């Protein structure tokens, strides 16, 4: 998982989710695309 200042969708399977006041990118197809903002 990457922690970044700005998160972007890396593919069409990525979803942007808000959890606990943080923005996350979760990907069903490629788990390497997981990211968290902050």
From Swiss-Prot:
NCBIfam families for this protein: rpmJ_bact
PROSITE patterns in alphabetical order: RIBOSOMAL_L36 (PS00828)
Swiss-Prot/TrEMBL GO biological process terms: translation
GO molecular function, one term: structural constituent of ribosome
Protein name according to UniProt: Large ribosomal subunit protein bL36
InterPro entries: Ribosomal_bL36, Ribosomal_bL36_sp, Ribosomal_LSU_bL36
Pfam families documented for this protein: Ribosomal_L36 (PF00444)
One GO CC annotation: ribosome
Recorded name of the encoding gene: rpmJ
Keywords: Ribonucleoprotein, Ribosomal protein
Protein family (similarity comment): Belongs to the bacterial ribosomal protein bL36 family.
